A protein has these predicted regions:
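N-terminal ligand-binding/catalytic initiation module
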Residues: 1-114, 122, 132
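Rossmann-like adenosine-cofactor binding region
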Residues: 184-218
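Glycine-rich Rossmann-fold phosphate-binding loop(s) that bind the pyrophosphate
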Residues: 141-142
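A structural signal for isolated positions on well-ordered beta-strands in alpha/beta enzyme cores
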Residues: 137, 161-162, 190
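NAD(P)-binding Rossmann-fold cofactor-contacting core
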Residues: 155-182
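N-terminal Rossmann-fold NAD(P) dinucleotide-binding loop
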Residues: 145-146
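Short helix-loop-beta connector
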Residues: 128-135, 157
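Aromatic pocket-lining residues of Rossmann-like dinucleotide-binding sites
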Residues: 152
Length: 218
């Protein structure tokens, strides 16, 4: 086997963004969900190891014979990292050649998680949402919010998306940032006064919050 085949790529968030779009990821998620339903992939339950410092190590493997590939995401949950301005859920994704067992790539798992999770919502919007949509609504502006918003914009040609978060300053800052970052989609991103204002007349709604209580009433 030549050296090129046994080498390992290290792919950052910027590397991944340069080669795959949200629309690409939505289609990839659709394919992955179908493979799970068809039983053509092996996805064991994740392994969790609890550590010190209220931390936990999560290992999530999968094997797709028809793709000759296996993968494992390692995501570590350390809630106190925020006290040191560190990510609370750092992650890496390992891609393995199914023919040789060689690790062929290591990807920024945090971004892969954001992208894949957002695309899951995008797939639902694409398959289940109305074909003609003009207004979107999103509640929450946390780590998953940017990808969820882009998935909504990629799935439907929206004119406007309202954003709400309990932290008014963060909501405004997020809306301004997303207006610039997602300008290619042509939608106006607006901070909402409250959750009711956010969802009023919305064609698509997504919540990005761990709240155990309802964040709006239908």
């Amino acid at each position: 086997m030549d050296k090129e085949r046994t080498g390992m790529l290290l792919l950052s968030k910027e590397d991944i963004k340069s080669v795959i779009t949200m629309k690409d990821m939505i289609e990839a998620d659709k394919q992955a969900f179908k493979m799970v339903v068809d039983g053509t992939v092996d996805t064991p339950l994740r392994t969790v190891i609890n550590g010190k410092y209220d931390g936990a190590f999560l290992f999530m493997p999968a094997y797709a014979p028809e793709l000759d590939a296996a993968a494992m995401k390692v995501i570590n949950i350390f809630p106190h990292n925020i006290d040191n301005n560190l990510m609370t859920s750092p992650a890496q994704t390992m891609l393995i050649d199914g023919k040789t067992g060689y690790v062929i790539a290591m990807l920024d798992g945090t971004y892969v998680t954001q992208l894949r999770t957002g695309a899951s919502s995008g797939a639902a919007f694409d398959l289940l949402g109305k074909k003609e949509c003009k207004k979107g609504a999103m509640i929450g502006t946390g780590g998953q919010a940017a990808a969820q918003l882009e998935a909504m914009l990629a799935a439907r040609k929206l004119e406007e998306v309202k954003i709400f978060d309990l932290n008014e300053e963060r909501c405004k800052a997020f809306a301004e940032e997303m207006q610039k970052e997602q300008a290619k989609y042509g939608a106006t991103i607006i901070p909402a006064k409250d959750s009711d204002d956010c969802i009023e007349d919305a064609d698509l709604i997504i919540t990005v919050t761990p709240s155990p209580k309802p964040v709006f009433f239908g």
